[in-house]
């Protein structure tokens, strides 16, 4: 009655001498073909979204509902999750992909044509700015700070309690 979402795990164990390595056949890696569909999350960005019925609804050992209620609620959960996801992706995926494409294209253009030339220009100009700043510091700021320091070096405070 419920929607089956689990895949059966089948493994075949053979000794190395049970088949010939020189038979001309290439044996496929079973992990590559565990799912016949295309991997739409190759970098595992959404691996934390594996949400199942047992993750949302759980009955403790001491209290259980009827088996038919549990099976029907599990089936309804899976079907509604499937249908709502498909419904939302039909109406939101294309507009959001369009907006994300425009956003990333704009950011790429700004980075390539404005930000990086500005940074490179600043890096080219910085050595001369550094020389000018060092001269201004040595000529104006250093003597001023030295004079203020000498003025305040003769100040002494004495605290007396009355």
Curated annotation (Swiss-Prot):
Residues 87-107 dip into the membrane without crossing it. Its main location: nucleus. GO terms for cellular component: acrosomal membrane; caveola; caveolar macromolecular signaling complex; cytoplasmic vesicle; focal adhesion; Golgi apparatus; Golgi membrane; nucleus. It comes from the Eukaryota. GO terms for biological process: basement membrane organization; caveola assembly; cell differentiation; endoplasmic reticulum organization; endothelial cell proliferation; insulin receptor signaling pathway; mitochondrion organization; negative regulation of endothelial cell proliferation. The keyword Cell membrane applies. InterPro entries: Caveolin, Caveolin_CS. Belongs to the caveolin family. Monomer or homodimer. Interacts with CAV1; the interaction forms a stable heterooligomeric complex that is required for targeting to lipid rafts and for caveolae formation. Tyrosine phosphorylated forms do not form heterooligomers with the Tyr-19-phosphorylated form existing as a monomer or dimer, and the Tyr-27-form as a monomer only. Interacts (tyrosine phosphorylated form) with the SH2 domain-containing proteins, RASA1, NCK1 and SRC. Interacts (tyrosine phosphorylated form) with INSR, the interaction (Tyr-27-phosphorylated form) is increased on insulin stimulation. This is Caveolin-2. It comes from Gorilla gorilla gorilla (Western lowland gorilla). The gene is CAV2.
